[in-house]
């Protein structure tokens, strides 16, 4: 279950995880981005998401298919969705100019990834999937939090529910 919010303090994740019917909860930072690519007059729309600070399994995790994970201490390293990278001829080592929250940044692709969330992806407002027209990138949590003014906060919670959960009750409690 995804629960977008404008901004919430990170400590609320523990409160969400303790709700009846919730088996796990994580917070992340999500933001819209514009990706400038050579040869294109207009930037491509995209979505930037935080990676957790921890190693190992996490909710809605990414599968690294090429390269390596971004170094959490290096704010200009990103993972790129493999289908977008393939459609645009991008690979680890390439650089992207990305506008995030009104600021242009030069980012280095260090890996390509897949995610269950983005098996079939359409840009907001679109009906048909086009891998070349919507990019997804992942960054270390501190880097993306700084880019979107979300230090110490999250703007989307991800929850998994146990078998006994009543969806309507969980939704009411999350609200």
For each feature predicted by the language model, list its residue ranges.
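Membrane transport/envelope proteins' first extracytoplasmic loop
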Residues: 1-175
């Amino acid at each position: 279950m995804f629960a977008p919010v404008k901004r919430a303090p990170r400590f609320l994740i523990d409160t969400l995880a303790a709700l009846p019917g919730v088996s796990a909860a994580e917070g992340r930072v999500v933001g819209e981005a514009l990706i400038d690519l050579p040869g294109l007059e207009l930037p491509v729309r995209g979505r930037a998401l935080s990676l957790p600070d921890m190693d190992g399994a996490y909710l809605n995790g990414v599968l690294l298919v090429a390269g390596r994970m971004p170094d959490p201490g290096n704010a200009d390293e990103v993972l790129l969705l493999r289908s977008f990278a393939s459609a645009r001829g991008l690979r680890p080592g390439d650089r992207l100019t990305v506008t995030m929250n009104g600021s242009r940044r030069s980012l280095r692709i260090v890996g390509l990834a897949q995610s269950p969330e983005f098996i079939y992806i359409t840009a907001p407002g679109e009906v048909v999937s086009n891998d070349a027209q919507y990019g997804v990138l992942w960054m270390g949590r501190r880097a993306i939090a700084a880019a979107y003014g979300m230090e110490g906060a999250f703007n989307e919670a991800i929850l998994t529910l146990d078998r006994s959960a009543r969806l309507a009750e969980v939704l009411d409690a999350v609200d």
